[in-house]
């Protein structure tokens, strides 16, 4: 059974967590696959500025919990609250629009796109232009494209990847692909970021 443990960290904006509702709360969460119970009676609450780790042996259900939180799976029982809002009946896209982003145990990048374009996929919710502007390449289109380019490079620089912006994502070393997946998740400006084994495949320096 997976277990939630606190991770020592610096709370950079602690005042937001005082007498505030948690950004994520699970109550008695569970799911059955046929006659097999994969997760049962899972409870947790995470504050807006907290960092927590979900630990457990292989097969304990950690990734299944992530899939329940992001609605890849619909729970058999229990509730998931995001910033005080019930996610019952929500789709994966709707949960994403509620401010939840995640990475995957198995990398899910667009390998044929450039590193920069992968980041722009995460930016699309926040940098918009009309279909007409895009088709006719109007000034508003180019303005938004410049904004997306600058923001993508800014995010890539967090992981020292700005010089890789023009590389094909699928050609990157495994550890760099892991970092790119995190950058793409950050591009969505999430309120809650879920990282499924983010350090897998990275060397100690990474």
Regions found by a protein language model. Name each.
Residues 1-206:
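Glycine-rich phosphate-binding loops of nucleotide-dependent enzymes
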């Amino acid at each position: 059974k997976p277990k939630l443990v606190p991770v020592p960290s610096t709370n950079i904006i602690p005042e937001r967590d005082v007498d505030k509702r948690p950004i994520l709360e699970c109550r008695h969460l569970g799911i059955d696959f046929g006659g097999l119970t994969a997760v049962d009676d899972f409870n947790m609450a995470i504050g807006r500025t907290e960092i927590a780790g979900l630990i457990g042996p292989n097969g304990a259900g950690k990734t299944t919990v992530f899939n329940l939180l992001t609605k890849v799976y619909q729970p058999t029982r229990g509730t998931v609250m995001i910033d005080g809002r019930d996610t019952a009946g929500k789709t994966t896209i709707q949960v994403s629009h509620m401010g939840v982003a995640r990475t995957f145990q198995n990398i899910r990048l667009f390998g044929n796109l450039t590193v920069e374009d992968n980041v722009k996929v995460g930016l699309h919710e926040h940098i918009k232009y009309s279909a007409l502007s895009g088709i006719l390449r109007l000034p508003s289109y180019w303005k938004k494209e410049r904004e997306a380019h600058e923001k993508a490079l800014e995010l890539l620089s967090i992981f020292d990847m700005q010089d890789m912006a023009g590389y094909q994502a699928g050609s990157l070393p495994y550890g760099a692909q892991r970092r790119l997946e995190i950058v793409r998740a950050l591009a969505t400006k999430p309120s809650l970021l879920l990282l499924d084994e983010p350090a897998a495949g990275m060397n100690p320096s990474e």
